[in-house]
């Protein structure tokens, strides 16, 4: 991660904590074209881990941790992320593996972040 990707990761953690009550323990961000791809580990609270012991609980958590997250970003646009990147937030794609407690979020912006911040090594 370069400096901008690390700063973006910190904003994702803070945003999730502020709007969901608990942020991920670790966030790793990679800029690729107009995407900020975030891998997040340690997302679940102790209560959610308990709920994940049943099939119904896992399904409910997966729905909450994907659909609810997208709704939160619609209702509360990530203005701090836009300000950091100087780009407009367009859309969010989210998925989570409840058993492994690892989530992925792909933030789509209106500019090529990879070109803007020179994040490729090849």
Q: Could you tell me what each predicted segment is?
A:
Residues 1-122:
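Interaction-mediating elements
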């Amino acid at each position: 991660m370069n400096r901008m990707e690390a700063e973006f990761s910190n904003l994702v953690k803070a945003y999730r904590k502020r709007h969901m009550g608990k942020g991920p323990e670790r966030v790793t961000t990679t800029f690729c074209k107009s995407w900020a791809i975030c891998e997040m580990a340690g997302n679940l609270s102790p209560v959610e881990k308990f709920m994940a012991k049943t099939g119904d609980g896992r399904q409910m958590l997966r729905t909450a941790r994907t659909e609810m997250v997208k709704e939160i970003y619609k209702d509360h646009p990530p203005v701090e992320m836009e300000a950091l990147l100087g780009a407009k937030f367009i859309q969010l794609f989210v998925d989570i593996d409840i058993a492994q407690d690892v989530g992925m979020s792909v933030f789509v912006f209106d500019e090529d972040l990879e070109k803007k911040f020179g994040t490729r090594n090849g």
